[in-house]
Amino acid sequence: MSYKIVIDSCGELLDEWKKDPRFESVALTLSVGGENIIDDENFDQASFLKKVADCPECPKSACPSPERYMRAFDCDADHVYAVTLSAELSGSYNSAVLGKSLLQEENPGKQIYVFNSKSASVGQSLIAMKIQECEEAGYSFEKVIETVEAYIADQHTFFVLDNLCLLYTSPSPRDTR
């Protein structure tokens, strides 16, 4: 069976995945001082951080649209999986679920599953690795979902921040203050 893994741009794609059509990143949009910056392969983190430091307003982010997820899901793969930034931090999960529903209205038998990573960044990448491992081992669609959901339940992600300024000014996550 063929498969595809879609991951929002908060997750990290391995170099080998960037060349593999079974993996696709969908970009979040970051806004600083009225400027929209797409978090894609052209994203310049140093420039973005300078803009954040120079801007008195809190930066904002926007998740990929349901239509963008729908386009990513619309492929020939038998099994399609999405790994999103934690639903507690972003609307990316809800957007992916809506994109799945939109595509399944047109293709009712399409097997798509959206994982709420309950994590970010490398945590999402580790989940994508687990999906790949399960698919390469020949697991059924249902067994991949069961195995990966158990993996997510046992996963713990810790973050180290240079400073807490963005956490204090950002409206999410809500319970960080």
Regions found by a protein language model. Name each.
Residues 4-65:
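N-terminal glycine-rich anion-binding loop in soluble enzyme alpha/beta folds
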Residues 53-98, 145, 153:
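Glycine-rich phosphate- or other oxyanion-binding loops that anchor nucleotides, phosphorylated ligands
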Residues 161, 167:
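Long, charge-dense, solvent-exposed interaction surfaces that engage phosphate-rich ligands
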Residues 168-177:
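Single conserved hydrophobic/aromatic residue that forms the stacking wall/gate
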